[in-house]
Every structure is written in structure tokens, then in C-alpha cells.
């Protein structure tokens, strides 16, 4: 229990606000702010926790993993920030060359950590994703490098992202009206 509390505290100490996520009123709507993490992406909420879980587990087992992730921006930046400098973990981030925003490119490529490897792919996000899927499908290869992922195929990430929906539900005082969550999304991983 103490270890879990320490992991959570460490994970969210990098956020700009004590409350990792906040509810604010905008007119007659309530908005859940998810941009207070180090990369300004909602994915920081799950990635920071996931990075700390990986580090804790791997240090206790004295094992190493190689995380491979495909991104068009936010996932890569959030994953790199969560994994950079952590022992026993390397992260390989595949993104489409010249098809991400300047800020996302800078967040992903200007670090100097020995465990972060950024790979620009000639193609689009689907090409990056297909490469990652092919690596996972090659069981001999993926097990030989102890490969793991942090894209939305990772259930620990999805669970960590789900928490803020429940958290916000319980913070909303007036439940006389139905509560609807509206999420701008490029794919299911945003939800």
C-alpha cells in the first residue's frame, strides 16, 4: 500500500497543479481539464503512472523491457516524458517524418536521454502503427527483446485514463441532469 502511494505521488509530482485534473465551469457546461501534465496532453495522466509502474516492477524483478510505440504526436511525447531516464526501460518511438506538429516534434526529439530512441518513418501514422503491429506479431522477435507497448493496446494505460471519468463524475455535485462525456478524438485511445 505504501509502495502504491509512493508511485502515485512520484508519478503526478511533475504536474503543474496539485489536482492532476480539474473541473471548471464554462457557461452551463463543466469542463474536465486534462492538460496540466508535462507535455500538456491528456495522455500524461496515464503515461506518468504507467512509466512509474514499469520502473517499480522492473527494478523489483531485475528485468529490462523495450517499449515500442507508434505516434502522430501526443502519445510519443507523453510516453517519452514518462519513460525518460528510467532504469531498465528503453523506449523506441516511431512517428511519421514531417507529419507531426513542430511542438510535438520538439517534445519528442530534443531530449538527451540514453534510453529514448526516436525514429522518423517515411510514411504516415498507419505505416508506423503497422510496423509496431508487425513487431508484436513476430512472437520470437518481441519476446527476445522483451517488448512492451504503451499505445491504447495497453490495458493498464486504458484503466489509468478511465479513472478521471469516475473522479469527475463524483466531483459533479448536481447529478439531476444526465452527465455526458464528449471527447474530441482521433481514435479510441483518446477515450
Regions found by a protein language model. Give the residues of each.
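PLP-dependent amino-acid enzyme catalytic core
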Residues: 1-191
Amino acid at each position: 500500500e505504501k509502495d502504491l502511494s509512493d508511485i502515485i505521488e512520484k508519478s503526478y509530482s511533475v504536474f503543474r497543479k496539485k489536482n492532476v485534473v480539474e473541473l471548471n465551469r464554462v457557461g452551463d457546461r463543466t469542463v474536465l481539464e486534462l492538460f496540466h501534465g508535462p507535455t500538456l496532453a491528456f495522455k500524461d495522466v496515464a503515461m506518468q503512472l504507467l512509466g512509474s509502474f514499469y520502473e517499480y516492477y522492473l527494478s523489483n524483478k531485475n528485468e529490462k523491457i523495450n517499449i515500442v510505440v507508434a505516434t502522430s504526436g501526443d502519445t510519443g511525447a507523453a510516453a517519452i516524458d514518462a519513460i525518460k531516464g528510467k532504469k531498465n526501460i528503453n523506449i523506441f518511438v516511431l512517428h511519421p517524418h514531417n507529419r507531426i506538429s513542430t511542438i510535438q516534434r520538439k517534445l519528442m526529439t530534443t531530449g538527451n536521454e540514453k534510453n529514448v530512441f526516436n525514429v522518423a518513418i517515411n510514411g504516415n501514422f498507419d505505416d508506423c502503427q503497422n510496423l509496431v503491429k508487425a513487431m508484436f506479431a513476430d512472437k520470437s522477435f518481441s519476446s527476445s527483446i522483451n517488448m512492451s507497448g504503451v499505445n491504447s493496446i495497453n490495458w493498464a494505460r486504458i484503466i489509468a485514463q478511465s479513472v478521471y471519468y469516475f473522479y469527475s463524475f463524483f466531483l459533479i455535485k448536481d447529478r439531476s441532469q444526465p452527465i455526458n462525456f464528449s471527447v474530441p478524438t482521433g481514435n479510441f485511445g483518446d477515450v
